[in-house]
Amino acid sequence: MRYLTAGESHGPQLTTILEGVPAGLTLLAEHINKELARRQKGYGRGRRMQIEKDEVKIFSGVRHGKTLGSPITLVVENRDWKHWQNIMSIEPIDSAEEVKRKVTRPRPGHADLNGALKYGHRDMRNVLERSSARETTVRVAAGAVAKRILEELGIRVAGHVIEIGGVRAERMDYRSLEELQQVTEESPVRCFDEKAAVKMMEAIDEAKKNGDSIGGIVEVIVEGVPAGVGSHVHYDRKLDAKIAAAIVSINAFKGVEFGIGFEAARRPGSEVHDEIIWSKEKGFTRRTNRAGGFEGGMTTGMPIVVRGVMKPIPTLYKPLQSVDIETKEPFTASIERSDSCAVPAASVVAEAVVAWEVASAIVDQFGQDRMDLIKENVEKMRRYAREF
C-alpha cells in the first residue's frame, strides 16, 4: 500500500490518495473522523484548533461502506481558507500586495531557509505552507484506514505520551492496551501517569507564558501482529526500518527507538537479548521484550514497542535571531500562529504512521487484493507459528 498527500496549510483543502487498500474492508467517514478529532485535542494546542473542525469526505474507492480495491481519495477542507483566499490565491495577485505579504525572515529549526534555497523561492510562505504539520491531518486519515485493516485482523494500536519538557511518566502499570487507551483518552496530555500529566501541563503553561515551546517523547504499541512480518533479506523490506523512517518523517521528530532502545548501548548482551521460550498453548515466544517486537527486521510475535522524540516546535512567540534574505540584515524570525506543545497530538500522528506501515506489510505479505483472503492467511500464519 502507499499514499500521497497534497495541499497547503492555509489552502482550500488537504487531499490524500491511498492505493493498494484491499477490497471488502468496511470503511465509513466516521471511522476516519474519530481519529481526526483525536489529533485536534491536546493541552498546548494553538488557536487554529478553535477554528478547524476536521471532517473527511470520501470521493472514491468506497461504495456502500465497503472498499473496492481501487484508489481511495480522502479530502479534509481547511475552514480557515476563507481568511487566506487572497494570500493563497492560485491566480496572480497585485504585486504590491504580494510584496507586503512576503515572508523573508526564515525561522531557525524550520524548513523555511532550506526550502527557499532548494526551490529558489524569495517568499518563504511557498515553503512553510507545505512543510507545516497541518499536513499530518491527512496522514492521520490514511492511518485511520490502516487501523481498520488491523482491527479486522485482531491487531490493536495504542499511542501515548511518556515525556514532555523533561517531565517523565513514572507510572506505567497498565494491565492491557485497552486500559492504557481508556486512561490516555481522558488525559489532556495523553499520559497514563496522572501525577506526571499535571506537571506536564504546568511545563506547557510555563513555556507558553515565556513565548517558548517544548517537546517530548511518544510511544506506540502494537499488539497481535503475527511473527515473521517483514524480512531479513533486504534492507528495504525490514519492517522496523520502515517504521523508523515513518516516525522520523513526522514534523519535528528527531529520533526513534524500539524496546529498550538506546539503553541497549549501556547493557551487556545478556541483559539485552530476549530469551526464547516454548509452550504448547503459545508455541515459541520470548521471556522479555527488550527488542520491542523485532529481530532481524521481522516481527517476533511480541508487542511492537516504538518511541519517537519530538523537538520543540520551531515557531516561537519569542523568536530567535535570523537574517532577512532580501536585506541580509539580522532580524528576529517571522512569527506564525502555532502551538506551544504538540506532543499529545503527535502521539496520534505516530499511531497513524505506525499503523500504516504495519498494515501495509501485512497486506503485502498475506495477499493484496481481498480482506477475506488476508484474514484467512493471517490466521493460517498464527496457527503455523503455534504448531511450529
Swiss-Prot record:
This protein's UniProt keywords: Amino-acid biosynthesis, Aromatic amino acid biosynthesis, FAD, Flavoprotein, FMN, Lyase, NADP
Superkingdom: Bacteria
Pathway: Metabolic intermediate biosynthesis; chorismate biosynthesis; chorismate from D-erythrose 4-phosphate and phosphoenolpyruvate: step 7/7
Flavoprotein found in the keyword field: yes
Cofactor field: FMNH2
A Pfam cross-reference name: Chorismate_synt
Record: residues binding NADP(+): 39, 45
Catalyzed reactions: 5-O-(1-carboxyvinyl)-3-phosphoshikimate = chorismate + phosphate
Enzyme superclass (EC): lyase
GO terms for MF: chorismate synthase activity; FMN binding
Cofactor mode of binding and number, as noted: Reduced FMN (FMNH(2)).
GO term, biological process aspect, one: aromatic amino acid family biosynthetic process
One GO cellular component, as annotated: cytosol
Oligomer and partners: Homotetramer.
Similarity-based family: Belongs to the chorismate synthase family.
Record's function text: This reaction introduces a second double bond into the aromatic ring system.
Name of the protein in its database record: Chorismate synthase
Organism encoding this protein: Geobacillus sp. (strain WCH70)
